[in-house]
């Protein structure tokens, strides 16, 4: 079969491999690529040689950061795989991949069962209604326990597992699986090291006598569960008739696609055992693009008008950009999922999210970081495109005559920042290039400039996130720079109005001097309404000439960058110019700007200035036995409890906690809950800092 884009969409699977960090996700992907003939040599994560981990830091840290898209073939079916990261700081990558997948393989560590990050990723997959099959990996590991892992899938995820296989042997003696559908054994001969076929061949044998009874018990449970998928099967089952393998497969497929149950397989990807039956299951049970409901979007000219696109080549072209990656030769690669229609390489399309025309230069199907050029892109597939200049993550590309905006992905605001100081002018230029490219790739990475210190401030989703971004700047863009400690972004405001404050700026040093006299009033604005600054001019009778009034406004705005308490930006201010005086010769725009700046500074000191801090919405999911400790810990961080409720097998605690109290929280939470609790944090609002805490921050900022 020509391994090109298949036109029969029933033979296509767009899947993700999702798991907790270290459950063996990348190794599993490598084995899939090996058995499907894409790879000729198996790369190990712990050797730093795997196909999908292609960024330098991924190879070093042995974790997957960027989801690489890989295309492979199995039994005449095309499987497009997205490898997703399992670390909490990269949830944005995971959300992006899940958004464009039709199904997923959830990989679990056979010894650890469901781990905190497996839970986070599982909930994200629930959010996007992604059907899943499960692969219990590392069955060769000391202490591996298949039945324990299945129990944790029920207790921690509240999911309904359908056991499809039982392990034969355990730890070093793990040699294969019992296939409950066909009631037979699949055994991989030889030790992984001595087996020249690398697990590509397995033998079909009788079920071992010591497992026969257990296999019959699990097979009966499987048949009973699947009989519920339709009335015909239920009737047949109740009449005592045998259900055929094809009937069982059809029932399992239907229930998997509806997310009513999750088929469970087991193996050891590292020892090359159990991967092929899992690939068969991807084809047998996970949805193809035709099984997925039509995509819903809206008309860019009328947000209320709902539009849909079916996964057919006859519909108008529509696609979603879900990832931007920098490529060493092609520059920017934009990964797209085509939902409907067809587009040729070189065609002009519209980015309906931004209202801009774009030209698709070349199109590729990707094998990690190798590219296979294709002439056109068709519904149901994932491609990498080059030549798109204005398209960023979450944007829709579509046919200009039939425009649609597919629902975009929403990304959380960054919560932590560090200052970066380039060592030389050359480094400053490299830093600008790096920032431009990295922020195009990653919507949760933001950049600003500290006017006073001239430092570049970068903000992201967590400490590891910023570490990796800084590391990429150094490696990929050769930026040499000093990096500060993580900081909280405080603000300042006032609580009291000052009705009149006079200020005269006067300088006489021979020749023409400088003169400006103004009287201003200031009052607080409600920042919750988004009102950060307002200026009003109430001067009458030309006492301050009209051309100088914008200078007073500019001077006050200048003063807002640098508050009177600790030098943080000032928000929530209304300033009014009430009166003033000028001199025909000595007055100038600069004199009035200085007067505006100094008048505001003095007035602000009288207006009861206070410090504001970012308050975060923190949600912790913890097993009930750790609830007391978790709540006590939140209180010690100046947190305020908002609510508490039950979810599947866990307690969900919601609280408002100052960001300054959240540094190092992930480590503390792990140690208090044996790594079983997970948390998420999003920005809520700015709130006043209690006086004792504020005094400490102010003293520190003044170097006292």
Swiss-Prot record:
Pfam families, alphabetically? EFG_C, EFG_III, EFG_IV, GTP_EFTU, GTP_EFTU_D2
Q: Which UniProt keywords apply?
A: Cytoplasm, Elongation factor, GTP-binding, Nucleotide-binding, Protein biosynthesis
Subcellular location(s): the record lists: Cytoplasm
Q: Which InterPro entries would you find in this protein's record?
A: EFG_II (IPR041095), EFG_III (IPR009022), EFG_III/V (IPR035647), EFG_IV (IPR047872), EFG_V (IPR035649), EFG_V-like (IPR000640), EFTu-like_2 (IPR004161), G_TR_CS (IPR031157)
User: Binding of GTP: at which residues?
Assistant: 19-26, 83-87, 137-140
Q: Which GO terms describe its biological process?
A: ribosome disassembly
Determine if Hydrolase is one of this entry's keywords. no
**Which GO cellular component terms are attached?**
cytoplasm
GO function term, MF aspect, one: translation elongation factor activity
The residue ranges of the tr-type G domain are 10-290
Listed Gene3D superfamilies: 3.30.230.10, 3.30.70.240, Elongation Factor G (Translational Gtpase), domain 3 (3.30.70.870), P-loop containing nucleotide triphosphate hydrolases (3.40.50.300), Translation factors (2.40.30.10)
Q: What does this protein do?
A: Catalyzes the GTP-dependent ribosomal translocation step during translation elongation. During this step, the ribosome changes from the pre-translocational (PRE) to the post-translocational (POST) state as the newly formed A-site-bound peptidyl-tRNA and P-site-bound deacylated tRNA move to the P and E sites, respectively. Catalyzes the coordinated movement of the two tRNA molecules, the mRNA and conformational changes in the ribosome.
What HAMAP family does this protein's entry cite?
EF_G_EF_2_B
What family classification does the UniProt entry report for this protein?
A: Belongs to the TRAFAC class translation factor GTPase superfamily. Classic translation factor GTPase family. EF-G/EF-2 subfamily.
Q: What is this protein called?
A: Elongation factor G
Species per Swiss-Prot/TrEMBL record:
Pseudarthrobacter chlorophenolicus (strain ATCC 700700 / DSM 12829 / CIP 107037 / JCM 12360 / KCTC 9906 / NCIMB 13794 / A6)
Lineage per the UniProt record? Bacteria, Bacillati, Actinomycetota, Actinomycetes, Micrococcales
């Amino acid at each position: 079969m020509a391994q090109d884009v298949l036109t029969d969409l029933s033979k296509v699977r767009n899947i993700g491999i999702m798991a907790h960090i270290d459950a063996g996700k990348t190794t599993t992907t490598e084995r899939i690529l090996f058995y499907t003939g894409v790879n000729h040599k198996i790369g190990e994560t712990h050797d730093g040689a795997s196909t999908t981990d292609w960024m330098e830091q991924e190879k070093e840290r042995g974790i997957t950061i960027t989801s690489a898209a890989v295309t492979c073939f199995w039994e005449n079916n095309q499987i497009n795989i997205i490898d997703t990261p399992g670390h909490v700081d990269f949830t944005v990558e995971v959300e992006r991949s899940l958004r464009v997948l039709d199904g997923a393989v959830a990989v679990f560590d056979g010894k650890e069962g469901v781990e905190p990050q497996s839970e986070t990723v599982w909930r994200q997959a629930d959010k996007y209604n992604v059907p899943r099959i499960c692969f219990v990996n590392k069955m060769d590991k000391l202490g591996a326990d298949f039945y324990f892992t299945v129990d944790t899938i029920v207790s921690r995820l509240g999911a309904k597992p359908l056991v499809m296989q039982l392990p034969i042997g355990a730890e070093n003696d793990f040699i294969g699986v019992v296939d409950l559908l066909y009631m037979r054994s699949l055994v991989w001969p030889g030790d992984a090291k001595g087996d020249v076929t690398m697990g590509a061949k397995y033998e079909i044998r009788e079920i071992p006598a010591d497992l026969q009874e257990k296999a019959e018990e699990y097979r009966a449970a499987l048949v009973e569960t699947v009989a519920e998928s339709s009335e015909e099967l239920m009737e047949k089952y109740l009449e005592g008739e045998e259900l055929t393998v094809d009937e069982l497969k059809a029932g399992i497929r239907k229930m998997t696609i509806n997310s009513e149950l999750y088929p469970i397989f087991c193996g050891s990807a590292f020892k090359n055992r159990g991967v092929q039956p899992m690939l068969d299951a991807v084809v047998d049970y996970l949805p193809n693009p035709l099984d997925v409901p039509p995509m819903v979007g809206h008309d860019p000219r009328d947000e209320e008008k709902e539009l849909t696109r079916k996964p057919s080549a006859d519909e108008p072209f529509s696609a979603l950009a879900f990832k931007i990656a920098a490529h060493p030769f092609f520059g920017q690669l934009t990964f797209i999922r085509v939902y409907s229609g067809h587009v040729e390489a070189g065609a002009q399309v519209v980015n309906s999210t931004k209202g801009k025309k774009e030209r698709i230069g070349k199109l590729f199907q990707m094998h990690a970081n190798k590219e296979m050029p294709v002439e056109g892109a068709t519904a149901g597939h994932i491609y990498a495109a080059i030549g798109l200049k204005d398209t960023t993550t979450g944007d829709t590309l579509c046919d200009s005559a039939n425009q649609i905006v597919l629902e975009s992905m929403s990304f959380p605001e960054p919560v932590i920042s560090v200052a970066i100081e380039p060592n030389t002018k050359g480094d400053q230029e490299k830093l600008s290039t790096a920032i431009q490219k990295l922020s195009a790739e990653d919507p949760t990475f933001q950049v600003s400039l500290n006017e006073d210190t001239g430092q570049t401030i970068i903000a992201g989703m967590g400490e590891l996130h910023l570490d990796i971004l800084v590391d990429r700047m150094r490696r990929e863009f050769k930026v040499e720079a000093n990096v500060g400690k993580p900081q909280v972004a405080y603000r300042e405001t006032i609580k009291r109005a000052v009705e009149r404050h006079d200020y005269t700026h006067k300088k006489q040093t021979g020749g023409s001097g400088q003169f400006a006299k103004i009287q201003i009033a200031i009052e607080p604005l409600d920042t919750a309404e988004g009102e950060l600054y307002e200026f009003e001019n109430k001067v009458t009778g030309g006492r301050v000439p009209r051309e100088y009034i914008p200078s007073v406004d500019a001077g006050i705005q200048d003063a807002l960058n640098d508050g009177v308490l600790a030098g943080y930006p000032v928000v929530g201010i209304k300033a009014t110019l009430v009166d003033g005086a000028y001199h025909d010769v000595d007055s100038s725009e600069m004199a009035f700007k200085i007067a505006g700046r100094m008048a505001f500074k003095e007035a602000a000191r009288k207006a009861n200035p206070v410090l504001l801090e970012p308050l975060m919405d923190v949600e912790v999911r913890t097993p009930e036995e750790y609830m007391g400790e978790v709540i006590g810990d939140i209180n010690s961080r100046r947190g305020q409890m908002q609510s508490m409720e039950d979810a599947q097998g866990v307690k969900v605690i919601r609280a408002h906690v100052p960001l300054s109290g959240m540094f190092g929280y992930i480590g503390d939470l792990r140690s208090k809950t044996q790594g079983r609790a997970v948390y998420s944090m999003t920005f809520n609002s700015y709130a006043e800092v209690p006086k004792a805490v504020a005094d400490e921050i102010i003293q520190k900022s003044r170097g006292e």
